[in-house]
């Protein structure tokens, strides 16, 4: 009996389409729906009835139109040409779509994910007779200032019968052939819902440095860790993620705009090409991939966009690179899940979200990690997901589910954002589970007393927050001098250490040696001032000391001048309080 590969539309509910007669179809197969051949994916099967989520607008689709299955899962094409690219949620390049259909995305449009005409300079690193395994490296291709390693597809292994000589090839040309006849190209396909296999996951030991003092010092993230940035609207989630994308120490950045405003993606597209990559000196876009799935694009494609993004990140991880994946925002993704679930008439759980929300979020975040690849390379994917709880309610299901999965929680505060405090991360409401893991690295690479200094700063900020409540009730005059000193030191730490000026070329990003120097300066001021109070100096005399202004200017000092500036301030602190000690 021949299996029928084509069915018909039985009912339509927004992006959810039910098709009858889908014999031989499999879960997560890609289908073409209607005369316009809209792209969809089977998400439930019941006999010959398939439930399809359509990645394009279904307006005008009618009952009885054909539904044809391709027999393949939703896959992305992985190879040279992805860097500097901007795609929609299912890896269709937006510049090619614009050439084909103008400024608006036409329905049913088919464009190649990668440039099939461009020739790449391939240099083989294997030869005929060698045995290759999944994710093994066949050779390299230069892409901008980046060395793109050509990988064997993860499920392929065997002995090489032939390898193409060094030269120029397109992504469709055969560059190697196995003895069993399998042909290998510069690119290969991989299904987005399947994590790429690895040899083993590694214990994280290196920090993912963001250039933001509050994150790198107080709430660090490991290379290969997962962090959440929850916050109400307008608190700076997108700006924080864009800043991490600009200044983070990852080799590759994958930025997924999932259901956010189109203007925010435009900001990225306008800003990133103008930004200089501190590592290479070239444009930052040359190591960035953007996936733009704005709020007015079909809901179902949002659900796919985060999987597309993490699959691209895993591909570069398998080449031995560290990759940062920004998902902005996972709440919009969860809303897409909720809408599709309600269209399919599934039983809702809390706030209408499907019961499997936690499992889906975990499946996404668990694809982060530092790994040893099948070929023996060390790579990492660090995931930073924004969460947009309605009204800033941190008890809503998406925030709570994310909280259980991620290891760093960077809570944004609308009050800080209104006060123009950037980054608006609440130092009393955030935490990182990676701090004890990274203490050894900080001791060896930054300063032997770094963890103790961080702990003291955290303690001072907590004491200041408690005293501020007293000040609001009875005023500052009710406090003793040593308590007023804590409030003054806390203010200095907030304004001159945790706060950064994103528009200042020096202060927008800070290195760890500079952060360490600033920590020592502020804590030395507190220690010397506390001793001076005990020796008879008043708090007003300390507050009026000109050295405070020099401490405030320290963060604007360029890296190459900072050591000399810091030594000068430390000497001045010694001189200022020396007379009091005597």
Swiss-Prot record:
Record-linked SUPFAM superfamilies: C-terminal domain of alpha and beta subunits of F1 ATP synthase (SSF47917), N-terminal domain of alpha and beta subunits of F1 ATP synthase (SSF50615), P-loop containing nucleoside triphosphate hydrolases (SSF52540)
Record-level GO cellular component terms: proton-transporting ATP synthase complex
EC number: 7.1.2.2
InterPro entries: ATP-synt_VA_C, ATP-synth_a_Xtn, ATP_synth_asu-like_sf, ATPase_a/bsu_AS, ATPase_F1/V1/A1_a/bsu_N, ATPase_F1/V1/A1_a/bsu_N_sf, ATPase_F1/V1/A1_a/bsu_nucl-bd, ATPase_F1/V1_b/a_C
A biological-process GO annotation: proton motive force-driven plasma membrane ATP synthesis
Substrates-to-products reaction catalysed: ATP + H2O + 4 H(+)(in) = ADP + phosphate + 5 H(+)(out)
The UniProt record lists the keyword Transport: yes
Annotated positions binding ATP: 231-238
Record key words, sorted: ATP synthesis, ATP-binding, Hydrogen ion transport, Ion transport, Nucleotide-binding, Translocase, Transport
A GO molecular-function annotation: ATP binding
Entries under Pfam families matching the protein: ATP-synt_ab, ATP-synt_ab_N, ATP-synt_ab_Xtn, ATP-synt_VA_C
Origin superkingdom: Bacteria
Signal peptide: none
Keyword ATP-binding: yes
Enzyme class (EC, first level): translocase
Family: Belongs to the ATPase alpha/beta chains family.
PANTHER family per the UniProt record, alphabetical: H(+)-TRANSPORTING TWO-SECTOR ATPASE, V-TYPE PROTON ATPASE CATALYTIC SUBUNIT A
Function description: Produces ATP from ADP in the presence of a proton gradient across the membrane. The V-type alpha chain is a catalytic subunit.
Name this polypeptide is given: V-type ATP synthase alpha chain
Organism: Deinococcus radiodurans (strain ATCC 13939 / DSM 20539 / JCM 16871 / CCUG 27074 / LMG 4051 / NBRC 15346 / NCIMB 9279 / VKM B-1422 / R1)
Gene name linked to the record: atpA
């Amino acid at each position: 009996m021949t299996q029928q590969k084509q069915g018909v539309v039985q009912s339509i509910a927004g992006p959810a389409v039910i098709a009858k007669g889908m014999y031989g179809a499999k879960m997560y197969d890609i289908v073409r729906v209607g005369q316009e051949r809209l792209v969809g994916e089977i998400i439930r099967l019941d006999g010959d009835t398939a439930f399809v989520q359509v990645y394009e607008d279904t307006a005008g689709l009618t009952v009885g139109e054909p539904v044809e299955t391709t027999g393949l899962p939703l896959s992305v094409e992985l190879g040279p040409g992805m860097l500097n690219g901007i795609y929609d949620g299912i890896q269709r390049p937006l510049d090619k779509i614009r050439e084909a259909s103008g400024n608006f995305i036409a329905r049913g449009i088919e464009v190649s994910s990668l440039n099939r005409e461009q020739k790449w300079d391939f240099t083989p690193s294997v030869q005929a007779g060698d045995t290759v395994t999944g994710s093994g490296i066949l050779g390299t291709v230069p892409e901008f200032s980046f060395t793109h390693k050509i990988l064997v597809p993860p499920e392929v292994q065997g002995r090489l019968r032939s390898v193409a000589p060094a030269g120029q090839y397109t992504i469709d040309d055969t560059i190697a052939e196995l003895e069993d006849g399998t042909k290998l190209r510069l690119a290969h396909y991989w299904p987005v819902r399947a994590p790429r296999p690895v040899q083993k996951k590694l214990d994280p030991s290196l920090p993912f440095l963001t250039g933001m003092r509050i994150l790198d010092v107080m709430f660090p993230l490991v290379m290969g860790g997962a962090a959440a940035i929850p916050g109400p609207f307008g608190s700076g989630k997108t700006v924080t993620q864009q800043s991490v994308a600009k200044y983070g120490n990852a080799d590759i950045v994958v930025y997924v705009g999932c259901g956010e405003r189109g203007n925010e993606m435009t900001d990225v597209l306008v800003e990133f090409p103008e930004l200089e990559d501190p590592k290479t000196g070239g444009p930052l876009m040359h190591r960035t991939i953007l996936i733009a799935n704005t709020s007015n694009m079909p809901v179902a494609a949002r659900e796919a966009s985060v999987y597309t993004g993490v699959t691209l990140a895993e591909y570069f991880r398998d080449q031995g690179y560290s990759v940062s994946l920004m998902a902005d925002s996972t709440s919009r993704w969860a809303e897409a899940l909720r809408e599709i679930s309600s269209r399919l008439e599934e039983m809702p759980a809390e706030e209408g979200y499907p019961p499997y929300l936690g499992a889906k979020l975990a499946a996404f975040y668990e694809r982060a990690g530092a790994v040893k690849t099948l070929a023996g390379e060390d790579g990492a994917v660090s995931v930073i997901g924004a969460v947009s709880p309605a009204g800033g309610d941190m008890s809503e299901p998406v925030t709570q589910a994310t909280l259980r999965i991620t290891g760093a929680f960077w809570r944004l505060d609308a009050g800080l954002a209104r006060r123009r405090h950037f980054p608006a991360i609440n130092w009393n409401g955030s935490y990182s589970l990676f701090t004890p893991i990274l203490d050894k690295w900080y001791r060896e690479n930054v300063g032997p007393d770094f963890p103790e200094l961080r702990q003291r700063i955290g303690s001072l900020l907590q004491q200041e927050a408690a005293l501020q409540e007293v000040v609001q009730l009875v005023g500052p005059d009710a406090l003793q001098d040593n308590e007023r000193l804590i409030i003054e030191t806390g203010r200095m730490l907030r304004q001159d250490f945790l706060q950064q000026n994103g528009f200042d070329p020096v202060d927008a990003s800070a290195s760890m040696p500079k952060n360490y120097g600033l920590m020592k300066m502020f804590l030395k001021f507190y220690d010397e001032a506390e001793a001076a109070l005990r020796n008879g100096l008043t708090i007003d005399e300390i507050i009026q000391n000109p050295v405070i202004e020099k401490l405030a200017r320290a963060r604007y000092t360029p890296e190459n001048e900072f050591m000399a500036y810091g030594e000068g301030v430390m000497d001045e602190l010694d001189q200022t309080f020396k007379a009091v000690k005597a």
